[in-house]
Swiss-Prot record:
The modification Phosphoserine is found at residues 39, 80-81, 83-85. It comes from Cavia porcellus. Residues 1-15 form the signal peptide. GO terms for cellular component: extracellular space. This is Alpha-S1-casein. It is found in: Secreted. The gene is CSN1S1. The keyword DNA damage does not apply. The lineage of its organism: Eukaryota, Metazoa, Chordata, Craniata, Vertebrata. Mammary gland specific. Secreted in milk.
């Protein structure tokens, strides 16, 4: 009986929820009074909302920076294509001062574009190789003929001299007579009988 009570107590202790240390204060205030618990809940909600707003603001700023970098890189590409076709002397007033971070972002974007082009070329090569292999397999399948099956011994050119005439067309006993033992007719007159006949 004591063992049963002890196991029940242990099971209930294990089944109780364990609260993290930072929420023990909240758990104790809920037991103490409902007014303090509602204020702490509101405070936690406000903190979560504030953190969420900060994350949204950071994401928005990052997306704006990325858009600016992309637009600048496209403008520079267009300007470089125009300057390569026509010799235009850039004015100092038109040039923008690019901070070091923007230069790093620009280099990263250029590397990404080169990497994307490289992967596209590799994918095209792989696709061409697969297509070539498919065409080869298709052509080989059309050329191949099924192998002829030779059931007779003399179908091969070496069969005539390898197998003698008595071996080539040997008549075999039917399989139904195999279980019946074969022994000489005068087996009763002999003194020694085979073991398998007994």
């Amino acid at each position: 009986m004591k063992l049963l009570i002890l196991t029940c107590l242990v099971a209930s202790a294990v089944a109780m929820p364990k609260f993290p240390f930072r929420h023990t204060e909240l758990f104790q205030t809920q037991r103490g009074g409902s007014s303090s618990s509602s204020s702490s809940e509101e405070r936690l909600k406000e903190e979560n909302i504030f953190k969420f707003d900060q994350q949204k603001e950071l994401q928005r700023k990052q997306s704006e920076k990325i858009k600016e970098i992309i637009s600048e890189s496209t403008e520079q590409r267009e300007a470089s294509s125009i300057s390569s076709s026509e010799e235009v002397v850039p004015k100092n007033t038109e040039q923008k001062h690019i901070p070091q971070e923007d230069a790093l972002y620009q280099q990263a974007l250029e590397q990404l574009s080169r990497l994307i082009k490289y992967h596209q070329l590799q994918m095209e090569v792989v696709h061409a190789q697969e297509q070539f292999h498919r065409i080869n397999e298709h052509n080989q399948a059309q050329v191949k003929e099924p192998m002829r099956v030779f059931n007779q011994l003399d179908a091969y050119p070496f069969a005539a001299w390898y197998y003698g005439p008595e071996v080539q067309y040997m008549s075999f006993l039917p399989f139904s007579s195999i279980p019946q033992p074969i022994f000489p007719e005068d087996a009763q007159n002999t003194e020694v009988m085979p073991e398998w006949v007994m």
